[in-house]
Amino acid sequence: MGLMDVDQTQLLSKMVIGDGHGEASPYFDGWKAYDENPFHPKENPNGVIQMGLAENQLTSDLVEDWILNNPEASICTPEGINDFRAIANFQDYHGLPEFRNAVAKFMGRTRGNRVTFDPDRIVMSGGATGAHEVTTFCLADPGDAFLVPIPYYPGFDRDLRWRTGIKLVPVMCDSSNNFKLTKQALEDAYEKAKEDNIRVKGLLITNPSNPLGTVMDRNTLRTVMSFINEKRIHLVSDEIYSATVFSHPSFISIAEILEEDTDIECDRNLVHIVYSLSKDMGFPGFRVGIIYSYNDAVVHCARKMSSFGLVSTQTQYLLASMLNDDEFVESFLVESAKRLAQRHRVFTGGLAKVGIKCLQSNAGLFVWMDLRQLLKKPTLDSEMELWRVIIDEVKINVSPGSSFHCTEPGWFRVCYANMDDMAVQIALQRIRNFVLQNKEIMVPNKKHCWHSNLRLSLKTRRFDDIMMSPHSPIPQSPLVKATI
């Protein structure tokens, strides 16, 4: 009982009590608002609709049907019990051979079989979160940095920085060219890091992009490859949305550039891919993360580090059987793309009816929604004010662009694949009602002439000042409490 009189934080490490996890962000506050008042069509029809979670529930029925028709794939059924002891016993860090083989084949299939993957280069980890952290531990030391094009997934601040002690240096991208990554932006970020005496060890790209829902074209990927080879830094390509592409242009993996574009000089030892089944197959709870490295030393070291976050053998066993079912996988990927395209069409079409535009996209589980016309002023404070209204009054959890480190106020990521058709229609109706109530402040085809000035002011600030940190110009978002 005496311990209760002591400040509990004094007994803990500085790392765990600090703010490095990144929870002090609107991205996570929106989740808390939903958790406190979740929408339910019957039990809580006025609750908050969760559109801040990039989860793929559009094909869950296909997986459920496969499991029902293949009970022997699970060691927890009468049909599969004979393999229980062999699978439940301790396995080495390499994982089940049949699982690694199945994942390698699936990765090739989601890339149109234009490239093959070596099962012996696959390292497992606890989801893409674990895969990113293990990769970072292998490639960089505390104080080193990775370049990351903005906007980027807020979880990278946790996954790459929190326990590794590295820095993330933003590569500026903006709406003037639909947020496309350029060679000049890469050079500017690299030189800025050098001026600040920060050693850059790598470049992290997300392809397809979260939050943009776009894919990188071949020329951009060639530029990236040339850049990292010239600077002698690592490239980590996050490709966890590779099978969510539902229309042209097609997804091009960095592996294809490495294998096919032989006119580009590049050291294969610098190239690494992070993959997962969470988005493509809708298995976030299975925590299947994959590191695929062309560097033998990284494969060896990552395998040792993966001992802290392995994928259970029961999960490996089930998924090996599923991914080796060629007929199922083929039909699943086709139907998944069809359903994602339909949901994207319905949602963006519904927004367009009230004059809301989104960045043109063809991948992912979300859209990058443009609400700049609804801002009172072209400032980050106005974006936060609008976001709070959307949470509190519209009762929808969307993620503001600032939480993705976007420097242009007014962009929001909206997820549409984690709900049924009815919830989508209710969400669209709420958005329409809100826009119609505020139509007088919307200016059609408004030119955002403030954009260049904002960029200039942000460039003069320290990097930490445009992050969600105690020094951020974005006010620390209080825990949002949505009310009925």
UniProtKB/Swiss-Prot annotation:
Matching InterPro entries: Aminotransferase_I/II_large, Ethylene_sulfur-biosynth, NHTrfase_class1_PyrdxlP-BS, PyrdxlP-dep_Trfase, PyrdxlP-dep_Trfase_major, PyrdxlP-dep_Trfase_small
Keywords: Ethylene biosynthesis, Fruit ripening, Lyase, Pyridoxal phosphate, S-adenosyl-L-methionine
Domain of life: Eukaryota
Pathway of action: Alkene biosynthesis; ethylene biosynthesis via S-adenosyl-L-methionine; ethylene from S-adenosyl-L-methionine: step 1/2
A Gene Ontology molecular function term of the record: pyridoxal phosphate binding
Catalytic activity: S-adenosyl-L-methionine = 1-aminocyclopropane-1-carboxylate + S-methyl-5'-thioadenosine + H(+)
GO biological process terms on file: amino acid metabolic process; ethylene biosynthetic process; fruit ripening
E.C. code: 4.4.1.14
The protein's required cofactors: pyridoxal 5'-phosphate
Keyword Mitochondrion (UniProt): no
SUPFAM superfamilies noted in UniProt: PLP-dependent transferases
N6-(pyridoxal phosphate)lysine: modified positions: 279
The UniProt record lists the keyword Transcription regulation: no
Summary of the function given for this chain in its UniProt record: Catalyzes the formation of 1-aminocyclopropane-1-carboxylate, a direct precursor of ethylene in higher plants.
Similarity field: Belongs to the class-I pyridoxal-phosphate-dependent aminotransferase family.
Assembly with partners or alone: Homodimer.
Protein name (record): 1-aminocyclopropane-1-carboxylate synthase
